[in-house]
Amino acid sequence: MLTDPDLPQEFERMSSKRPASPYGETDGEVAMVTSRQKVEEEESERLPAFHLPLHVSFPNKPHSEEFQPVSLLTQEACGPRTPAAQHSTMEVDGNKVMSSLAPYNSSTSPQKAEEGGRQSGESVSSAALGTPERRKGSLADVVDTLKQRKMEELIKNEPEDTPSIEKLLSKDWKDKLLAMGSGNFGEIKGTPESLAEKERQLMGMINQLTSLREQLLAAHDEQKKLAASQIEKQRQQMELAKQQQEQIARQQQQLLQQQHKINLLQQQIQVQGQLPPLMIPVFPPDQRTLAAAAQQGFLLPPGFSYKAGCSDPYPVQLIPTTMAAAAAATPGLGPLQLQQFYAAQLAAMQVSPGGKLLGLPQGNLGAAVSPTSIHTDKSTNSPPPKSKDEVAQPLNLSAKPKTSDGKSPASPTSPHMPALRINSGAGPLKASVPAALASPSARVSTIGYLNDHDAVTKAIQEARQMKEQLRREQQALDGKVAVVNSIGISNCRTEKEKTTLESLTQQLAVKQNEEGKFSHGMMDFNMSGDSDGSAGVSESRIYRESRGRGSNEPHIKRPMNAFMVWAKDERRKILQAFPDMHNSNISKILGSRWKAMTNLEKQPYYEEQARLSKQHLEKYPDYKYKPRPKRTCLVDGKKLRIGEYKAIMRNRRQEMRQYFNVGQQAQIPIATAGVVYPGAIAMAGMPSPHLPSEHSSVSSSPEPGMPVIQSTYGVKGEEPHIKEEIQAEDINGEIYEEYEEEEEDPDVDYGSDSENHIAGQAN
């Protein structure tokens, strides 16, 4: 039994917070469980304090100091617990102590009351403090707490690694690790060395798991890179295959284009072989070389003489024309003689199916016209001056006619339009000598000439050189000859104009006297589908009233605007690159290009427009723009607008194209003209076979009802009046002026005053 002096000492030891050794002292003193008052004080302070019930008076102090960290660890581990949980824990421990005390008292032998009480106190202390199972449980709790803290620290330090570790660590592996750790806890003595060893093992495992995770991530990255490289290779292969396909498509397109060109060349060769040409000369200013042409069998008008002493600045150019062009004959030949004449030509040339000839039974002189067409570059035998711009500008169907009796008749149907001027010895009412016929052998030689492509190319080049020479030598008489015949000198408003016109007239008269003066008639192109040779007359004439300005008032050209200034050079470039392109297509190209240009690019042309307008205003202060009146056309007795007439002719041309494409063979007989007017004979040539398209020319195929473009001005009784001939506008403004305004109103025609006496073109 405990003595009274011992009680204060025991309470004093119980109140101390220093943990004691679990092993009891030799004197048998027992450390009691902390009192309820102590627990309440700790709860009020909210400081968790959990003391192991250890014996106080153990003499070995190192043992007591050894377990100080353990008690501290338990305090820290129990830190998060609430005071209520601590209180319940203490009560449970007290109950366990009391339950363990009862069997111990019953098992003791009967002794003295003091000894029994003392033994019971020792048993209580041993049951509460000294059992190894209790120590093992406390150490297991400490180790679990350490593991939890380590895992929390790892989670805080590496939060992103947690999902990968949880994926790698399966539930079975976790259970195995926990079981292994709990099984080894029994052998732990609770020393810091053992705890450090466990910590090292845990860190080793963590390092292994981290390295495994890094390896898996590296393998995953490698797989990603490999997949990306494979995708890139596939993309490159697809691009390569696409490029190869595009290249193959381009090669196929080139092959198709080459095949198309070959087909076109074959068609041209076939046309040249099937339709051998007759050669007609384009007469130079003198006829020195015409004798050589006559010796070769070319058909020449009889009114020309060979002058041996004259110089020949221009070599004669023999130009073939198309089968669709007309052949001229003399009035001395009747219809039967004309049929025999053409039959002889066809027999000599061995014309293939599809060949057509047009005839004119009345005229001053005759000439034969050949089938295939080459560019005509010079169409006069007299030296009427031709302006530089008129020579440089190719003639096309969209050009308005401009006339002058001093100029040669040139058809406004692109640069390969031949024309023929014929001399009348005694006037339009007198008969003249029939045209000479060439021998069949000469026709055969001309066939060989045209079939030779090199010879044709050479002829074209020589013709272009002749153009340049004409432009250089005849630049001085630019565009003013047309005024000579349309305006009387007495009607001039100023003395300056009168003097200029007199000088021009004198120059023209001198050259005409040197070369021989020619009068001109007008040809009516008539075609009939009859095969019996009957004269199918189909006339259509265009009349223009001279409204808006007086017939004797001179025409003043409008100043060019910015577009005209720019299009002047551009049109020439396009025509040099594509000489057979139709003017309407060129106008469309120029219009689209002009719209695509920026204002900065257009600025210099607007400045030029302002300069030209100012210059025009200074030169003509009283100028007032007066547009031409609208034209009408008489077709088979019906009065039609020009647009309606063009639509009719377009439909007829389309029908004729379809007719010839089918390959039907028909001979068009010679048609007689309904009316022969004194004046010029103009031959409208056919386009070159080098451009077998619908845009080459209006007259790309024979068409019925080709209209007579006729003016009623100046025909007085029986006096032979010199008619004005159709010719292209000069390039310096008239043709561009008409292009722009005809697009605005296709029925309104703009041009020179002399054109009031000529109706527009059939296109």
From Swiss-Prot:
Residues 102-111 have a biased composition (Polar residues). Its main location: nucleus. It is found in: Nucleus. Gene3D superfamilies: High mobility group box domain (1.10.30.10). Residues 1-30, 77-138, 369-426, 714-763 are annotated as: Disordered. GO terms for cellular component: nucleus; transcription regulator complex. The keyword Transcription regulation applies. Forms homodimers and heterodimers with SOX6. Transcription factor involved in chondrocytes differentiation and cartilage formation. Specifically binds the 5'-AACAAT-3' DNA motif present in enhancers and super-enhancers and promotes expression of genes important for chondrogenesis, including cartilage matrix protein-coding genes, such as COL2A1 and AGC1. This is Transcription factor SOX-5. It comes from Rattus norvegicus (Rat). The gene is Sox5.
